[in-house]
Structure formats: structure tokens, C-alpha cells
Amino acid sequence: MSEKKYVAYVGSYTHGSSRQGIHVYDVDVENGTLTERSSVEVSNASHMAVSKNGKYLYSIEDEGVAVFKRDKNGDLSRINSVNIDGMRGCFLSTDVDGKYLYVAGYHDGKVTVVHTHKDGRLGSLMDGVFHTGLGLSLIHI
């Protein structure tokens, strides 16, 4: 029997009065089952990423990005959130040192760089670049 415990974070779109956008599940690898343990309030958690050190979970939310502290059991507690000055993001990634969080969005073609603090807080927006045009140019013969 496996002694190691696994946790799954499932992000979802929210609607109506429900804002429970992240669901926390215990994963039983022996039996292949998921058991919902809790849910966390965040609107439209369409993408999530874990920090390089594993201590924090970043989530897209309606107007920006939220960060949650992961405790030793995998439970989440909100630290803070930042607005990304644009439409909703849809992808998150950190740099190799964990100093910056990159937020990309389909709707407005923007990539935003957010500073991350050692204590997990999201800081100021460092940069934002909008893509212009229609993507790959086609060569006509």
C-alpha cells in the first residue's frame, strides 16, 4: 500500500452565485479514485500553475491572477491577487527562479509579467506586451 498522499487541484469556470472555482481532491492511486475535500472561492479558474518551490498555487481569475498558499496537506489559503490590466488570462508559467509569473491571454493577445515575492505574494506588473496582427502570415503564390 502506498504511504504517499496525492492532491489534485481542479479549476473550473463559475456561473451565477457560485464562485467555488478550485476544487481540492484527495487522489487514491491504489484504487484510482478522487474524493473532493474542499473548494476555494475564485471566479473562473481556467488555468493554474504550482510555484517552482511547490509552496504556492497560482490561478487565473476574472480580472487577473490569484495566489494561494499550499499547506502540508495540500489545502489552500488565499494570499492575494492582482489585476493584469487586460482581458482574462488563460495560461500561467513561472521563470526558472520563481521570481516572475507570466500570464498570457487569447482574447487580447497579451503577455503580462508579474513580480512574485518570496513570501508568495503577487507584486507589481513588470511588463505587458500585446501581440498585433493575425498570427502566421501566409505566403500566396
Language model features with spans:
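Residue-level detector of Asp-centered blade-edge/turn motifs that repeat once per structural unit
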Residues: 2-4, 52-53, 96-97
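Short loop/turn segments immediately following beta-strands, especially the blade-tip
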Residues: 26-31, 68-74, 114-123
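Conserved small/polar residues in nucleotide/adenosyl-binding loops
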Residues: 139-141
